[in-house]
């Protein structure tokens, strides 16, 4: 797998499979909190707890807590599929920083919205915000890649991000569920800011270049990876 030519890395490149380490940590925390609900509440992000009990560590720990096996499975599946590919491009240290920081930022942004809208009893848990950031990063690292939806429908990775953005906005505005659509959107926002500020890359320009040059007759670039 070749890295995109436009990429620069602030950290010296290292690789030690940080993605797998994150998966293991998530699984361990899941079983610890599954049998100890008090621990689950202490680690999940709760506006009320943060404001009244100063439990600021929740901005970090919430992304390792999951409410059920299905929640855990799909998040870890997404992390493995997209995380390994991104980590190979930016290196393990950068990937860890990216994943953890984006998870904190997406949770913090959600916290502010919940606070301003009077939703102090909302409990936020799960790696979804960070996973959406990883999906965004995949679309930047592999803009020519096609992701196969339902196993047969190929969609360019940048287009997939756009589709998910629309879906999450619609779900947030017009439906009611216990899914943190707002945090998913903030995961995209956090990743966008990370690439702009930390990596010096404008994802919009990257995607525009790819989509404008998208011609079935042209030679494909060396950053293709189909999933």
Where are these regions (language model features)?
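Multi-pass alpha-helical transmembrane bundles in non-GPCR membrane proteins
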Residues: 135-168
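Alpha-helical transmembrane bundle and helix-membrane interface signal
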Residues: 88-89, 141-153, 199-207
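Extracytosolic (periplasmic/ER-lumenal) interhelical loops and adjacent juxtamembrane/interface segments
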Residues: 39-64
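C-terminal transmembrane module of polytopic alpha-helical membrane proteins
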Residues: 1-17, 21-27, 93, 167-227
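Helical transmembrane-bundle signal
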Residues: 26, 30, 106-107, 161, ...
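Hydrophobic alpha-helical transmembrane segments of polytopic
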Residues: 18-26, 99-102, 157-160, 164
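Transmembrane helix-loop-helix
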Residues: 7, 14, 18-21, 34, ...
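Alpha-helical transmembrane segments of multi-pass membrane proteins
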Residues: 27-41
């Amino acid at each position: 797998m070749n890295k995109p030519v436009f990429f620069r890395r602030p950290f010296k490149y290292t690789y030690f499979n940080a993605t797998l380490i994150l998966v293991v940590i998530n699984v361990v925390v899941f079983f610890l909190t599954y049998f100890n609900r008090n621990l689950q509440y202490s680690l999940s992000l709760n506006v009320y707890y943060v404001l009244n009990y100063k439990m600021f560590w929740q901005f970090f720990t919430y992304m390792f807590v999951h409410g059920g096996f299905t929640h855990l499975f799909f998040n870890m599946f997404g992390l493995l599929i997209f995380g390994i590919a991104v980590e190979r491009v930016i290196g393990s240290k950068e990937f860890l920083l990216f994943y953890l920081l984006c998870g904190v930022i997406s949770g913090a942004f959600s916290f502010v919205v919940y606070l301003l809208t009077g939703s102090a009893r909302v409990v936020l848990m799960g790696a979804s915000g960070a996973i959406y950031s990883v999906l965004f990063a995949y679309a930047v690292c592999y803009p020519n890649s096609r992701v196969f939806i339902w196993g047969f429908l190929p969609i360019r990775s940048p287009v997939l991000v756009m589709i998910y953005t629309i879906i999450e906005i619609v779900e947030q505005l017009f439906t009611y569920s216990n899914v943190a659509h707002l945090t998913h959107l903030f995961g995209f926002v956090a990743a966008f800011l990370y690439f702009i500020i930390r990596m010096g890359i404008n994802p919009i320009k990257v995607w525009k270049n790819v989509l404008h040059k998208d011609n079935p007759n042209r030679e494909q670039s060396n950053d293709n990876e189909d999933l």
